[in-house]
Amino acid sequence: MTREAAIAHALAHFDSGAFQRDVARRVAIPTESQNPERAPELRRYLVDEMTPAFEALGFTCRIIEEPRAKGPFLFAERIEDPSLLTVFGYGHGDVIRGLDDGWEPGLSPWTLTERGDRWYGRGVVDNKGQHSANLAAQASVISTRGRLGFNAKWLIEMGEETGSPGLREVCSAHLDLFRSDVLIGSDGPRPDRNRPTIYLGTRGGASMDVFIDAREGGHHSGNWGGLLSSPAIQLAHALASITSPRGQILIPEWLPTGGLPDPVRRALSGLELDMGEDSPAIDPGWGEPGLSGPEKVFGWSSFEILAMESGNPRGPVNAVPPRAWARCQLRYVVGIEMADIIPALRRHLDRAGFPFVQVEPAREEVFPATRLDPDSPWVGWALDSMRRSTGKEPALLPNLGGSLPNDAFSEILALPTLWVPHSFNGCSQHAPNEHWTAELAREALVVMTGLYWDVPESGIARRR
């Protein structure tokens, strides 16, 4: 049997509606990891849904518990021959909150609904549809070839949307069990929905609370205004000192030393951003001057104020508020020292005259920045495979603009990491009306079936 036959098998699986039914069944399990009441659903997804799917393909499965995690982990492996290459797969079955009331009439986060070319449902792209596509592609290779031609290991976690607590501990505790030659996973969007894409790592993400606690209780703004310091005004000035009025970061420790690396600039040359037909227009003058849009997202750091509060926004009263607070976030690239992010902000605020502004980490888990060397033989192999499968020129991203727990694989397991996203920027993945397109879902099966078929022919030596 041939590569073309394997891809034809995958397309027949899609065209029959079987793949959509698999995704629909998984979307119907409300695996909200941010909702403690959904904890039983996290386990049900692994035990009742994914374990049978893996076992049907000859995998052996086990549930791994970790006290720090929001839910269990599923490890599945299919060992055909210890001398063969081993591919490690990853997915997360948890989703963010459904936000049920915000969906368009006739749509529900827990019912896969097809409207035109779109499939609506919570998790349809983040991440249930994406790891379903990869597993279906492996099934097509097995059905066509009679075997994968390599060993396969998978880890499905249920806490990615809460920062992947426990994932690093699980990887550290199971180094031998998880030993592999490469990670091939799928999450996140393509920058251009029409171009198959590989990204080699992720920007890091660090969230922090920046706040002022000036005094106990509010005081009448008529009697005390002009006499008491205003935490809101002070915090606004402090936050404004972090960037220019156009969003250029002014803390040197948060930026790549020496500017944009030449390999990153070359990889991003000519890349166009497709943010989706329902997305806002890009503000070309925002952010770091002199960089293209792709360079700002994939090669540079960005700072955001995610939320701010002082007083009572829903019911303002005539009082000087005692407190002002902001949740901030830095997305950063390889080369920024993760442990120095908050200390650098502290030093900056002190220099700027704001020693009274307090800074605290907003969450325990921080995603480090990671990036595989673009010259890795796995990169050229994957790009060639995708060209062959689709007839399109794939995009190569040094890293995703968002954050993933890629460091668990690239640093702890020491794996080369290839991420092949099957989504697009306008998919509403963390909002109501999350959706995939049938066109992208179908092409995902083509791309992944070709990649898995080509693994035995890669000529890349096993790691020792």
Segments from the language model and where they lie:
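Acidic/histidine-rich catalytic neighborhood of metal-dependent amide-processing enzymes
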Residues: 119, 123-201, 460-463
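Acidic/His- and Gly-rich active-site-bordering loop/insert found
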Residues: 2-124, 143-150, 328
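Flexible glycine/proline-rich, aromatic-decorated loop/lid segments
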Residues: 198-213, 418-423
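Acidic, glycine-rich active-site loops and adjacent beta-strand->loop/helix elements
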Residues: 93-95, 118, 155-164, 186-190, ...
